């Protein structure tokens, strides 16, 4: 722009997820996760989404908070290893069943072919729901105990997702517990 010197493209550091988190931050996040249970249900749901966005930010995953598209809401998204994950987050009184899993799968199928999903349910998933949901989907699942164990043991979120994705690719099972892969 004016002059003989060519314009240099802006330099951007390559995206890198954190492989470790300060143990003090993990403890604070773990305690905040526990404190969410004291909130009223609707307030707790929004607070849980905000908590997850902060967790993704701390882990260097370039999160996006919840957003609306025509006819649907996505609870958030993040990037990991050049993959975009769409988030479904629920904090309910009972484990998640097949209808919620299929509903989220439908959202993923309406996006780009390379889209992936992560369904984080504080209350877990029913065995019947997981069996009926089937195998070979582009969704992995986490429950509240997974989050607690990850934070309590100071395991980076990226490592948890990577191992869950690998296990899902190898077995077809969308849900494997953190304690079974670490």
Task: List each language-model region with its residue ranges.
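Mixed-charge (Asp/Glu-Lys/Arg
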Residues: 1-182
